[in-house]
Amino acid sequence: MATAHDLRRIALTLDGTTEAPHFDRAAFKVARIYVTLAADGQTANFKLTPDEQELKCLTAPDAFAPVGNAWGKQGWTTATLAALSGPELARALELAWRHALPKPRAHQKKPVET
């Protein structure tokens, strides 16, 4: 059974992660937010792809559900922390964290030499 303390502890070990308030939630982000923790510590919303969301919801319907608005259609997924094991929480956090990493700049302009 995972807890809010577990989420915070694991998230802050992921490279570049910071914690900041986000409305009534705690947000964990690198370049972008990848997970938010509810104020009551019972649930968290993870940044997943729609395909990852579908898989999580099919394999663990007691733990995962789409966020109930337009964000859910983009893959944002609510997890009930008490329904997750520690390793399941760690896998979900790492998956979401990877989606929030800065994108490489493929076409960076070089300075003009004069």
Where are these regions (language model features)?
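Charge-dense, helix-prone N-terminal extensions
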Residues: M1-T114
